[in-house]
Amino acid sequence: VMNLWPGVRLRVMEGWDEDGHHSEESLHYEGRAVDITTSDRDRNKYAMLARLAVEAGF
C-alpha cells in the first residue's frame, strides 16, 4: 500500500467477530477473515487493494 499510494495507510476495520454482525458462514467467526480499507476511504482503490491482498497470500 505505501509503495503504491504514498501517504495512504491500510486500515483494519474488523477481523474477529463474535457478535453476529456477519452471515452464519462468515470466516470472521473463525478469525480467518478481515475487513480492510484505506485511510482515505477511496473506493476506487478497493480492486487493487484486493489484488494486493491476494498477492500477499490472504
Curated annotation (Swiss-Prot):
- SUPFAM superfamilies given in the database record: Hedgehog/DD-peptidase
Top-level taxon of origin: Eukaryota
On modification after translation, the UniProt record reads: The C-terminal domain displays an autoproteolysis activity and a cholesterol transferase activity. Both activities result in the cleavage of the full-length protein and covalent attachment of a cholesterol moiety to the C-terminal of the newly generated N-terminal fragment (N-product). The N-product is the active species in both local and long-range signaling, whereas the C-product has no signaling activity. Cholesterylation is required for N-product targeting to lipid rafts and multimerization.
Q: Where along this sequence does the record place binding of Ca(2+) 2?
A: E14, D17, D19
Pfam families cross-referenced by the UniProt entry: HH_signal
Q: Which GO terms describe its cellular component?
A: extracellular space; plasma membrane
Q: Where in the cell is it found?
A: Cell membrane; Secreted, Extracellular space
Q: Which family does it belong to?
A: Belongs to the hedgehog family.
Record-given protein name: Indian hedgehog protein
Record the organism: Rasbora paviana
User: What taxonomic classification does the UniProt entry list for its organism?
Assistant: Eukaryota, Metazoa, Chordata, Craniata, Vertebrata
Gene label = ihh
